[in-house]
Amino acid sequence: MRLSQYFMPTLRENPAEAEVISHKLLLRAGFIRKSASGVYTYLPLAQRVLKKIMQIIREEMDRQGGQELMLPILQPAELWLETGRWHVYGPELFKLKDRHNRDFCLGPTHEEIITDLVRREVRSYKELPLLLYQIQNKYRDEKRPRFGLMRGREFIMKDLYSFDRDEEGLEISYRKMYEAYTNVFTRCGLKFRAVEADAGAIGGSTTHEFMVLANSGEAVVVYCPDDNCGYAANLEKAETKFTPEVIGTPAEIQKVATPNVKTVDEVAEFLKVEKKQILKSVLFKADDGYVLAVVRGDREVNEVKVKNQVDCLVLELASPQEVEEVLGAEYGSIGPVGVNIPVIADLEVKHVLNAVTGANETGYHLTGVNPERDFSPAVKYADIRLVEEGEPCPKCGKALVFARGIEVGQIFKLKDKYSRKMGAFYLDENGQQKPIIMGCYGIGVTRTMAAAVEQNHDEDGIIWPAAIAPFEVIVVPVSNKDEQQMKMAEEVYNLLLNAGFEVVIDDRDERPGVKFKDADLIGIPLRITVGKRTVSEGVYEVKIRRTREEKVFQKEELVDGLRQLLKTL
């Protein structure tokens, strides 16, 4: 491939709209262009990277017995109505009508349509297990698309679905996919962690997220530094070893005026108490009712854990108006004493024996609150808070460590969540009808490309891992006007091409500095410079993009030398 003929519109400056480094560099280096908010065109360089990622995925899925198919993007509403997700999924679901006024959606995920396929085709236990996957575009109407390919409205995903006779079979399929995902991201040259996670809108029981570690990541990865322990979870799922801490001694409950005192910090200062003695209350709207979540003042409520305890379809923070209507006071003055709605309190709350909490009257708080004495007997105690860095690991007790990560894949044990709702059954050896047990497994292909850039870059541009780089080697003649340099550049270009390398030659009529900057910007792992030294001494200077090291090879050493270098990159 010749850069003089290659469609690679690079930019000299960072685009103003780009917020994260992958967005900036993929735009600058000519990989992507914005077509609409959250919608991008993948230019030739990006397409080469995406094809490599997809090829790695296909090889690992096929290795585990996966069979590739292609499901429709356009999905009929009836299937989503069967599972109840047509209304639950929310405004992120792209909905449309055809000319006959029939409802459809653009698939953000494909559980319904693949379950429909399997329920119509699979009848017997002899046809199971089954692993079916696809790689194609998905659609999600994000309210605020941002961060380039990280959160778009159109994106490429691989999703595989497993169909088994029972949970033992599902466990085998799940472990196969866990292994396959580990292989995929390892082969892509990425540093990552598999972490326990919450199932979210897809549902199911056990689930793991695969997180590429990067300082710019939106997600927080919580893990134990002891490799022998191996505990890791995302922040929403993470737990800590619970050790009760008794705070205060029982006292009489009293109502005290706290004018214009609303936050935990303000209450602590006004009443001269520690934050952990204060009880923080948060009102949520859950489906058709309300629930009050209570944690210590030095902790934060974990909305995902609350939702799982309530077992509702939709959980959202109550508005200030709803807080006043339900509890009769403003935020900052609400609390769990004397309320007639469900209360879920964190496990630590029970051990605060002399607590401060809102009095459900604006401008007043209660002191001397004892949960065992003053809360409703119906209060539910559960782990509903976010863990903090340094707290003990729930498995081994060592201090938990936080890191930032980018979710690039997730695997779920769906069990019979969809098969029962949609009537996907099979007949076992005894002729008895049983639900097919399912799992689903997704990889964000475009997100993986962006995450690779977030993890692998410097001030000069992208540093692609060799396995997913658009090209492995770029040949740069210093002067297009020097016939001998051009001749030797062409010779080495053809040599590498014939040896099976993915190589490009920069034959553009540009200054050497421009060529070198572009090579660094687009992130090709190895750059061969053909200059005066090449002509005079017959040697080729090879620069390693990742380390900036330079090595010198004779022509006859070049093929083996480059192969060895690429193995390390």
From Swiss-Prot:
Gene3D superfamilies named in the record: Anticodon-binding domain, Bira Bifunctional Protein, Domain 2, YbaK/aminoacyl-tRNA synthetase-associated domain
Pfam families: HGTP_anticodon, tRNA-synt_2b, tRNA_edit
Protein's cellular compartments: Cytoplasm
EC number of the protein: 6.1.1.15
Major subcellular site: cytoplasm
Catalytic activity: tRNA(Pro) + L-proline + ATP = L-prolyl-tRNA(Pro) + AMP + diphosphate
A single cellular component GO annotation: cytosol
Keywords for this protein: Aminoacyl-tRNA synthetase, ATP-binding, Cytoplasm, Ligase, Nucleotide-binding, Protein biosynthesis
One function term, GO molecular function aspect: aminoacyl-tRNA deacylase activity
Family statement: Belongs to the class-II aminoacyl-tRNA synthetase family. ProS type 1 subfamily.
Known partners and oligomeric status: Homodimer.
Domain comment quoted from the record: Consists of three domains: the N-terminal catalytic domain, the editing domain and the C-terminal anticodon-binding domain.
The protein's name in its UniProt record: Proline--tRNA ligase
Organism this protein belongs to: Carboxydothermus hydrogenoformans (strain ATCC BAA-161 / DSM 6008 / Z-2901)
Gene that specifies this protein: proS
